[in-house]
Amino acid sequence: MKIALSFLFLTSTFSNAGKIGRLQSVAVSGQLNCLGKPAVGVRIDLMESDNNGEETGIIDDNDFMGYTYTDSAGFFNMSGSEVEISGIEPYVNIFHKCNDGLSPCQRQLRVDIPKSATASGPAPNETFSIGTLELSSRKVIGERRSCAYRNLTQTS
């Protein structure tokens, strides 16, 4: 009996990718501006941190949950899901060229999403809003440079 219950528990926690854990999801929205105007065509990646904010890959690579681009008004809305044993730690990476001059590649801004915004199952109950962000600020905590999307074109 114990073996059967253990088997049922383990098989109920597998995802289609073969991971052990439970399916969790998150939705996020916001508006991005550049110099007071909508930041159009900015790429946003929805990620899940597997190494407590350190993007070293020592523990486990961070999980990619999807991407989108801002619309003509600078808005974005996206959701994603991931199987994890513990609670997911979602964040978005925003890749942009706002107020960047001729610098190579893009500015990359990480915005963490609180665990309280996550839900069990494939679809989140609510959408977490990061609000309106002005990307032209020169010194932003959590920002670095990225050449992941070299051909990214966007307007402001």
Swiss-Prot record:
Gene3D superfamilies: 2.60.40.3330. Residues 1-17 form the signal peptide. It comes from Caenorhabditis elegans. Belongs to the nematode transthyretin-like family. Coiled coil: none annotated. Its main location: secreted. InterPro entries: Transthyretin-like, Transthyretin-like_sf. Keywords: Glycoprotein, Secreted, Signal. It comes from the Eukaryota. Glycans are attached at residue 151. It is found in: Secreted. It holds the Pfam family TTR-52. This is Transthyretin-like protein 1. One of its GO terms (cellular component) is cell surface. The keyword Glycoprotein applies.
